[in-house]
């Protein structure tokens, strides 16, 4: 029986007792006792729904790994028929199979099986869609010309997201603040919810578009429109969850300010490429969300390597980025039916090797078990940490946040009456970007038995030490 205290993480030891009374630990696993998954979101994804997923055991095996990593919410990417008509078929008659935007086959039974399998494991299922997308046949489905946004005031050049010619269509953009469009897409979502047991809507946008205009020639305020759109979606389906992407932080304050999203989601790019930028985003989001909303990063690892070749993820780069994100109190959208390397979620250019898969289990055990120290409300602390030794031959240096190359970075905060000190190893780092674009980040140099001196306030009752590289 789980303890009664809500929103608490635990690390459980599985052990046996020897004849002499000593305990032998056989393994450890994290447990999250929380009544609402959005308090500590650990977000995953699925992105392929073709015939290969109908084979016995495929979906179950994929979801078993996500479950072992304590993933508690799953985003369904590129599952939909059309951006303006997401359901494959009609409310009254579902298509057995339909084509997604890239003309890949999507089987309705596969979508349904993913949802039911996730629900059986205690996960929530979120469907993905833009807030303002329509394909080139939208007029035949009832989308009106007056709802679009344009690149100029002459109604001649619709804003669009252009795609390869082999795909279904380019995506043409509508005004997210247009109330008729809101009512239209909310009804299409109602068709989805009536047929598929999704728990909510993962809303997407496309970042700063520059100056754009509505049908009447008025300049469009997209961030304000996003807030209006979120409000309309929540009003139509008050019991469904909402999350919206803030691409490069665009519209983040307006999204959070609605009070209608369940956590904050930032897709980060080259303009926010530094480890220090992740800290800036989390602190800004904490203010935008009135200290109540957690942050999930869609942060694509080894991006350039994935764009030019196939192979494996660079394990040290992935783990260093996760270590920083977790220390800062965030989580990382990266695990799904494969590991994420590009904004096109179905891309499988890079794969996890067995070492990285094992490390992911340890890291997610760590994030889950220690979620209260990592992700509960905190205040940054000015705790002085220094080397209590004169061994110059070890070539060690410590610095306070933000990170520096050739140093161990200290990030300290006060959480729940405890002082938490993170030691992040950048001793061998070849750059200070979380992206590890070409997969070149070296494994950190291992240092051990280093005496540290810490100046802390108050009486020290106990000191605990934990690391996902050793303990979880």
Give the label of every model feature segment.
Residues 24-82:
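An acidic-aromatic substrate-binding cleft motif
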Residues 51-68, 181-195, 247-255, 314-322:
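Short, acidic/polar
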Residues 1-36:
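Beta-strand-enriched, solvent-exposed domains that form extended recognition/catalytic surfaces
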Residues 380-410, 414-472:
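C-terminal beta-sandwich/jelly-roll accessory domains of carbohydrate-active enzymes
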């Amino acid at each position: 029986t789980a303890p009664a205290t809500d929103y608490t993480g635990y690390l459980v030891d599985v052990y046996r007792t020897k004849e002499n009374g000593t305990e032998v630990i056989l393994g450890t696993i994290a447990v999250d006792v929380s009544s609402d998954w959005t308090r500590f979101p650990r977000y995953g994804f699925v992105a392929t729904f073709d015939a290969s997923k109908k084979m016995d055991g495929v979906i179950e095996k994929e979801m078993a790994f996500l479950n072992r990593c304590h993933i508690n919410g799953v985003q369904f990417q590129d599952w939909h028929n059309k951006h303006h008509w997401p359901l494959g078929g009609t409310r009254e008659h579902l298509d057995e199979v339909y084509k997604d935007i890239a003309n890949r086959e999507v089987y309705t039974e596969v979508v349904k099986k993913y949802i039911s399998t996730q629900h059986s494991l205690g996960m929530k299922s979120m469907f993905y869609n833009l807030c303002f997308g329509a394909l080139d046949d939208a007029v035949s489905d009832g989308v009106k010309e007056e709802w679009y946004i344009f690149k100029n005031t002459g109604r001649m050049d619709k804003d669009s997201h252009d795609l390869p010619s082999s795909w279904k269509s380019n995506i043409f953009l509508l005004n997210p603040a247009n109330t008729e469009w809101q009512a239209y897409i909310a009804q299409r979502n109602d068709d989805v919810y009536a047929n598929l047991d999704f728990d909510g809507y993962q809303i997407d946008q496309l970042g700063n578009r520059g100056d754009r205009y509505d049908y009447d020639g008025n300049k469009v305020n997209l961030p304000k429109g996003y807030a209006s759109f979120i409000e309309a979606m929540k009003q139509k389906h008050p019991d469904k969850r909402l999350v919206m992407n803030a691409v490069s932080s665009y519209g983040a304050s307006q999204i959070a300010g609605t009070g209608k999203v369940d956590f904050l989601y930032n897709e980060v790019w080259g303009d926010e490429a530094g480890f220090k930028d992740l800290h800036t985003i989390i602190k800004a989001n904490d203010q935008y969300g009135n200290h109540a909303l957690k942050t999930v990063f869609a942060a694509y690892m080894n991006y350039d390597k994935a764009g030019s070749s196939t192979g494996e993820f660079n394990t040290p780069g992935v783990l260093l980025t996760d270590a920083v994100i977790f220390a800062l109190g965030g989580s990382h959208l990266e695990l799904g039916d494969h590991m994420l390397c590009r904004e096109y979620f179905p891309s499988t250019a890079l794969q996890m090797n067995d070492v990285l898969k094992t490390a992911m289990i340890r890291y997610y055990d760590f994030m889950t078990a220690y979620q209260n120290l990592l992700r509960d409300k905190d205040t940054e602390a000015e705790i002085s940490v220094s080397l209590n030794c004169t061994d110059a031959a070890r070539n060690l240096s410590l610095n306070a946040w933000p990170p520096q190359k050739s140093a161990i970075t200290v990030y300290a905060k006060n959480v729940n009456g405890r002082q938490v000190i993170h030691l992040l190893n950048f001793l061998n780092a070849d750059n200070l970007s979380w992206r590890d674009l070409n997969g070149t980040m070296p494994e950190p140099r291992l240092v051990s038995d280093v005496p540290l001196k810490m100046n802390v306030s108050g009486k020290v009752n106990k000191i605990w030490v934990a690391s996902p590289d050793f303990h979880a």
